[in-house]
């Protein structure tokens, strides 16, 4: 992988991780377009780690709050993490095999999940604007957000979009919905990084150090910008432009694959 490719992928990861457009789906599509094949999944995980840096910066106070009595939010975060953790362990390899295979089926699957995210955002916007409730976060809503996150391990389904939508439907107030959704990314990304790191130790993945460094730094900077933008978007509950963009990406995913096979 060239350094410029790593920077491009890092920028895409940083923006797409926190905007509701699916970072894994974008990385998968872009890696295919750039011809990046070696260590693609491991590089993807490392870029996700890069996006954790701005989460710690922006939500430092919220993270400290997890360790204060009565530890209610910490318990909710653990509960919200369990579904995605189990899904990743049980189905992670199957999902990766289907989506990272480079086949026409993988392109169709990615297009489908992009469209599902577009639909989800459209429905979420309608619900959020119609509901007048602004409930505090609860165990019930945290569980709903956790179940939503377990579905969003599939490339093309936006983790942030899916989780925030679940919070919206549960009636959680926008500020708590946003902060908890971003906090939920921490254990999931760290867990995925641990699994990927074990694969590297076993010698299954070739590491390209310099591209990874540039990619991670780029992801951190663009991720910070994306978080600030997304916090404003959530306050206005205006997701329609993201829905339209995802429809376009669904078309790009399937059309580029079909064109290459002609």
Task: Give the label of every model feature segment.
Residues 1-262:
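Multi-pass membrane proteins that catalyze or facilitate reactions on polyprenyl-/lipid-phosphate substrates
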């Amino acid at each position: 992988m060239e350094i410029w490719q790593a920077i491009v992928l890092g920028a895409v990861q940083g923006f797409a991780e926190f905007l509701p457009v699916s970072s894994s789906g974008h990385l998968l599509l872009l890696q295919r377009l750039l011809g990046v094949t070696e260590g693609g999944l491991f590089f993807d995980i490392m870029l996700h780690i890069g996006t954790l840096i701005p989460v710690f910066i922006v939500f430092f106070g919220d993270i400290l709050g997890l360790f204060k009595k009565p530890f209610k939010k910490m318990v909710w975060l653990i509960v919200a993490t369990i579904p995605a953790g189990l899904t990743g362990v049980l189905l992670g390899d199957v999902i990766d095999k289907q989506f990272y295979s480079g086949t026409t089926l993988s392109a169709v699957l990615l297009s489908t999940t992009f469209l599902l995210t577009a639909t989800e955002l459209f429905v979420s916007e309608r619900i959020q604007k119609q509901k007048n409730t602004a409930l505090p976060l609860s165990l019930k809503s945290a569980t709903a957000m956790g179940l939503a996150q377990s579905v969003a391990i599939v490339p093309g389904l936006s983790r942030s979009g899916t989780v925030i939508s679940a919070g919206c439907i549960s009636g959680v107030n926008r500020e708590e919905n946003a902060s908890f959704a971003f906090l939920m990314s921490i254990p999931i990304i760290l867990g995925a990084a641990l699994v990927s790191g074990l694969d590297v130790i076993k010698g299954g993945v070739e590491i390209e150090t310099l591209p990874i460094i540039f990619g991670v730094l780029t992801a951190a900077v663009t991720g910070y910008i994306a978080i600030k933008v997304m916090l404003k978007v959530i306050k206005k509950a205006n997701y329609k432009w993201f829905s339209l963009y995802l429809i376009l990406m669904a078309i790009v995913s399937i059309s580029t694959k079909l064109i290459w096979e002609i």
